[in-house]
Structure formats: C-alpha cells, structure tokens
C-alpha cells in the first residue's frame, strides 16, 4: 500500500502540472473503486486548480468550487501523461488539464477512492486524524505522553492514524529497527529517551524515502512512471531470513495486528 512518502512523492510530482491550470473535464472508465467516484468529479468543467496538498495518505486537489480527495488504496498510482496517451486496462480515472497533459489514475486492485468535498472541515475521512509525522506537533514528549499505560504493541500502535498519520507497515518496521526497539514491546514500556529517538528516527526514515521517490514493492510508480528507489535501502522490511545489514543475524518476521512485521532480534531490544 502506498504510504506517506509515496503519496508525498506523487503530490510533488503532479503539483507543477496542475496548479495554475484548469481541469477541463474528467474521464472515468470505472467508477467502482473502494467507493464510487463522486458525481461532482464526473461533472467537472474548466475548474482552476488552486493547490495540491496532502493530509495523511490523502491527496487534496483544491479547486475554485471545492476539493478532490484522492486515496491511492492498495495499488494506486498517479502519472502525468500527454493527453492523447492510450489508456490501459487498469487506468480508471483521467483529469484532462488545460496544458495538454492528463493526470491518470491507475489502480489494479481498485481499493482507492476519488471523493469530493465542498469544505475540508466537513470531511468525514479527514476527521479525527493525528498530527503529521514531519510536523513540529509530533515530538518525543507527545509520543511519550500518549504511550503511558498503553498495553498495545508498539508496532500496531504507531500505525494508528489517531496517534500519528502516515506511518504505515513498511516505515513502522524500518523506524523501529533504526531506533533499536523491538516491535512487540508494549507501547507503555517506552522511556522518554526512547520516545525522543523513535520520533527523530521516524522523521529521518520518512524524509529519506521521500528523497528516493518512495518505495516500490509491486505497483507504485512516481508521476513520471519511475519506481520508488527506497526499496533498495530497506533494512528489515520484506527481508525475513536474510542477514541483518548491521550484525548478520537473520531477520525475523511476525504477525502483529494481522500485518507482517520484520525485525532483528539482536539489534532491537
């Protein structure tokens, strides 16, 4: 599933082609995504694009009349293409832009979403989200305070969007490894020092992935059609049985909250 770095990479890639131009119209080949494509998107006509933002794993395209909210789901990606580029089997939504380009949404598994919102303050999907992990609001003190008396395992706890947004399966595993913290410890066992280290590590891992264009394990592509190169730097995720890059101990895996977790039993405590 595309996580925060992949969504931010997509945002940065499409923004220069959208802002200052207009969406002439939308082409929807298959409206049966996770939720049906909103009727307001189907009816778009000559709508100026004011900004392209991100909140958690949602892309927010601001128009003069409202907002398009895009979620990439499990396998979605966005590309900027020449308007005449022929569509493929899994290309479900196009936004035709006034500069001769098309924003194309590809999603083999169709778990993504294209929604409309008149006002973000009233959006149900954006309500109750925690702070952005790269913001000043996400601090060691915040994480430590939230962890008090929590028996939930650290790994699934970090993936709760009410705690902090955008730290998905890949980056939770990678951050815990880099911070030297076992994923199956209770969240309440974090010390103040560990909370500070973990927050700094999460920020560093996410920023590094954004620099590398995100992580491509299967379907994700950047807006220019290239894969995300952070996959080449993964320390533990998807490496069960392979030697730890730091100590040589075989990487282990476990199921936490029905999600696969990867860790080094020697480097993490």
From Swiss-Prot:
GO terms for biological process: base-excision repair. DNA binds at residues 90, 109, 150. It catalyses: Hydrolysis of DNA containing ring-opened 7-methylguanine residues, releasing 2,6-diamino-4-hydroxy-5-(N-methyl)formamidopyrimidine; 2'-deoxyribonucleotide-(2'-deoxyribose 5'-phosphate)-2'-deoxyribonucleotide-DNA = a 3'-end 2'-deoxyribonucleotide-(2,3-dehydro-2,3-deoxyribose 5'-phosphate)-DNA + a 5'-end 5'-phospho-2'-deoxyribonucleoside-DNA + H(+). It holds the Pfam family zf-FPG_IleRS. Its cofactor is Zn(2+). PANTHER family: FORMAMIDOPYRIMIDINE-DNA GLYCOSYLASE (PTHR22993:SF9). Monomer. HAMAP family: Fapy_DNA_glycosyl. This is Formamidopyrimidine-DNA glycosylase.
């Amino acid at each position: 599933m595309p996580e925060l770095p992949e969504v931010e990479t997509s945002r940065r890639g499409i923004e220069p082609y959208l802002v200052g131009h207009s969406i002439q119209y939308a082409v929807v080949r298959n409206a049966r995504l996770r939720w049906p494509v909103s009727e307001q998107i189907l009816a778009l006509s000559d709508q100026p694009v004011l900004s392209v933002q991100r909140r958690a794993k949602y892309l927010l395209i601001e128009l003069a009349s409202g907002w398009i909210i895009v979620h990439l789901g499990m396998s979605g990606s966005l590309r900027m293409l020449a308007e005449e580029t022929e569509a493929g089997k899994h290309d479900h939504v196009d936004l035709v832009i006034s500069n001769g380009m098309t924003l194309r949404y590809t999603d083999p598994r169709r778990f993504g979403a294209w929604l409309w919102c008149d006002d973000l303050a009233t959006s149900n999907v954006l309500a109750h989200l925690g702070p952005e992990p790269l913001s000043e609001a996400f601090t060691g003190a915040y994480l430590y305070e939230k962890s008090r008396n929590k028996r939930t395992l650290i790994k699934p706890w970090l993936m709760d969007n009410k705690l902090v947004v955008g730290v998905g399966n890949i980056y939770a595993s990678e951050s815990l490894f880099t911070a030297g913290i076992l994923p199956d410890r209770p969240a309440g066992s974090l010390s103040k020092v560990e909370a500070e280290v973990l927050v700094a590590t999460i920020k560093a891992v996410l920023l590094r992935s954004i620099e590398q264009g995100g992580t491509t394990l299967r379907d994700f592509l950047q807006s220019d059609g290239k894969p995300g190169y952070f996959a080449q730097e993964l320390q533990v995720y998807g490496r069960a049985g392979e030697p730890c890059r730091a100590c040589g101990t075989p990487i282990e895996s476990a199921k936490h909250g029905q999600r696969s977790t990867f860790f080094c039993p020697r480097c993490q405590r």
